[in-house]
């Protein structure tokens, strides 16, 4: 076979050099991201805040808060890993606290509409995500409701087998409390995942 020679690149016929290149995404919509809600889990409070966006300036709506935090639930556990009875009692308490937020979520500020994205930067919830296998430093870091349910089932299995310890789970009352609160919140709010910041 003979050798081939490369010719210098020539402009395409019909496209003058000084005119802009055609734009191929005309008519495509660059939709803004969905409205976001920040979940804050503190020692003595759970709170939800609408995060500011271009269509939702800061202070446009009242937050939702309830006097139930990870420390509140950990104290109900006796500041140790829960027993079957203390877990059942805590589930009822947490349900009573998170269920009213469903009404708050169905009344978004003017100019917003579902779907919403739930975000959190709460350290204990980040720890729950890490135990579930979420890589926090690779965006988007998302913890699914199913992953939370799987962790909760492991915790439940552990406490229903006296003397058994799941060594992959942190053996701290506050971690178990945060897991329980997140599990009940995602379930009762109908949220499939939470983004971790």
Predicted regions and their residues:
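N-terminal polybasic/positive-inside topogenic patches
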Residues: 12-22
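Helical "lid/coupling" subdomains associated with nucleotide-phosphate turnover
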Residues: 25-36, 65-197
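Short beta-strand scaffold segments in enzyme catalytic cores
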Residues: 46-52, 57
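Beta-strand initiation motifs
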Residues: 56-64
